[in-house]
Regions:
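Predominant activation on well-ordered alpha-helical scaffold segments within soluble catalytic domains
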Residues: 21-28, 46-50, 60, 91, ...
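A generic structural signal for residues located within well-ordered alpha-helices
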Residues: 15, 19, 85, 194, ...
Length: 341
């Protein structure tokens, strides 16, 4: 039996604590670039410390969200491009709280992997810090777990938690939505972070396409198209004058069909005109290759619309000018469902 170096039994079992400490210590300076004066304490403490400044907010409401990236990670791992999925995670979480009217305060990440690869970890932290700086939130903490008995070689998973704040009187909950209000769609740049299990089945398994392949109709090689970074809509939403947005829906894993109803009053329907915008070619490719129904496409994918804002006709022109969005439908009397036209 091979003799195990004293103190290295855990490393021989697949968990190298010393390597983890060295890698994380080397990236502390990058993480600090996301800090403002609100962040207290040092990196690596048992808990992240954040001195919230709620000046100008009479009744602050904290808003939280947690999410993952899903099987988009399979594409990142296959191509060795990892920073983008870290950005995806931050932006997805920011959008999820932006629909309530909240602005982000801080973000925490979780990385679980078969082993800690310094190159992969460096790219992930680069992506997290880039998106946090762009989103004006601090990367206040995280957890990195080496789990050789859980993940296959080279695999990892990501999750993220975000905390934001909004004035209670400014919460967006859809309660002010009425028939005749308009739906303004903000464009996505691709799949964002959902539908990748189906997309991979169709594009890679059924159609036998290669991630490095240039496919007719796509602006980039297939893999790069699939790794386009999830857009962050919070800043443009925050630029719209107070009160003009009546409700907002982040269009992710249930598509327009499942996610618009989350903000509809019980007596309202959303009538979506699907011919009012151009569906990106990647979705058409998936639909044709997989022989997928229109209904299912709009329930799995965002189909080119990453965020929907509900506004009155009075404010629509100003919101359109500010967001570069498109009117994609309207609110009608109904029972809380979405109708595709």
């Amino acid at each position: 039996m091979r003799k195990v170096e004293k103190g290295k039994a855990y490393a021989s079992a697949g968990v190298d604590i010393d390597l983890g400490n060295r890698v994380k210590k080397g990236l502390q300076a990058r993480v600090r670039t996301t800090f403002g004066p609100e962040v207290l304490g040092r990196i690596g403490g048992f808990g992240g410390l954040f001195k919230a400044d709620f000046k100008g907010i009479k009744e602050p409401v904290l808003v939280s969200s947690i999410d993952g990236v899903g099987t988009k990670l399979k594409i990142a791992i296959a191509l060795g491009k990892h920073a983008t999925v870290a950005q995806d995670l931050v932006n997805h979480c920011i959008n999820d709280i932006a629909v309530t009217g909240a602005r982000p305060l801080f973000f925490l990440d979780y990385i679980g992997a078969e082993r800690l690869d310094p190159v992969v970890f460096d790219q992930l932290i680069f992506g997290f810090t880039k998106a946090c700086k762009e989103g004006h939130c601090a990367l206040i903490g995280g957890e990195t777990a080496q789990l050789p008995d859980l993940y296959r070689s080279g695999e990892y998973d990501l999750a993220g938690c975000i905390i934001g704040v909004v004035e209670r009187t400014r919460l967006l909950d859809g309660s002010r939505i009425v028939p005749s209000d308009l739906l303004i769609g903000l464009p996505s740049n691709g799949l964002h972070t959902n539908g990748y299990t189906l997309a991979r089945k169709v594009l890679l398994d059924k159609m036998q396409l290669d991630l490095l392949q240039k496919v007719d109709g796509l602006a980039k090689p297939l893999g790069d198209e699939l790794l386009r970074v999830h857009r962050n809509y919070q800043a443009v939403m925050a630029s719209i004058p107070l009160g003009q947005i009546k409700g907002a829906a982040h269009i992710t894993g249930g598509g327009l069909i499942d996610y618009l109803p989350r903000i509809l009053p019980a007596a309202c329907d959303a009538l979506v005109n699907t011919s009012s915008w151009t569906v990106p070619p990647i979705f058409r490719l998936i639909q044709r290759g997989g022989d997928i129904s229109r209904e299912e496409m709009y329930q799995v994918f965002n189909m080119g619309i990453g965020m929907v804002l509900v506004v009155s006709k009075l404010h629509a022109s100003g919101v359109l000018l500010q967001t570069k969005g498109k009117v994609i439908g309207q609110i009608t009397a109904g029972s809380g469902k979405v109708c595709l036209g």
